[in-house]
Amino acid sequence: MGYVRWLGHAAFEISIDGYTVLIDPWLTNPLSPVKVEDYRDKVDLIIVTHDHGDHLGESVELLRINRRARFVAVYELANYVAEQLGGATDRVIGANIGGPVRIPDINLKVMFFPATHSSSRGTPTGVLIVGKETSIYHAGDTGLAAEMALVGELYSPKIALVPIGGHFTMDAYQAAKAIEMLRAKVVIPMHYNTFPVIRADPEELKRYVDEFKLDAKVVVLKPGELYQF
């Protein structure tokens, strides 16, 4: 049995098909229930959606204490991370929006999709992870985007992790529309209440999902809690 564990903000720990995956591991965020050291020698894969500090987080430090872990991001961001580690390494894999990324020793499908946001190193993205146990879409930082409908049409991810804080990303109303396009069955809100400017009530997302009569379950996690699948 796998799980999705919210670590505050947009950071998640995912256990899928026997792998431990971290997405956007800003583990020093104000809501975080964990420390970087908690993950020493425990991580198989780190995925980062874009280069903003609240998403890249402690990726480099985590790679240093997880010598076998792989890192995947868009090409320009991956190059930056490799430089921080001292130069080119096969542990850091640069990819782009498109089909599945080939990751040595990791038997998961990982695909990047466009996100409507900003980024200094490469294109901002959302990411889809497809394993034998389930499929999970992490939307990254994004506004509402038409490409989400294509993700839903092609892959219908079973679990969607969507921002609801507004100001920098979608709010709850737009996130509900994103859920409709993604066709996800389970939705976990993220990227809210870290700072006053992105304060939001996740119950509002539930209300919109009910109002739109969507076939989706909204799972509200407290930092550190997990959803098992």
From Swiss-Prot:
Keywords per UniProt: Hydrolase
GO molecular function, one term: hydrolase activity
InterPro entries: Metallo-B-lactamas (IPR001279), RibonucZ/Hydroxyglut_hydro (IPR036866), UPF0173 (IPR022877), UPF0173_UPF0282_UlaG_hydrolase (IPR050114)
Record-linked NCBIfam families: PRK00685.1
HAMAP family referenced in this protein's UniProt entry, alphabetically: UPF0173
Family: Belongs to the UPF0173 family.
UniProt-recorded name of the protein: UPF0173 metal-dependent hydrolase Hbut_0886
Organism name: Hyperthermus butylicus (strain DSM 5456 / JCM 9403 / PLM1-5)
Lineage: Archaea, Thermoproteota, Thermoprotei, Desulfurococcales, Pyrodictiaceae
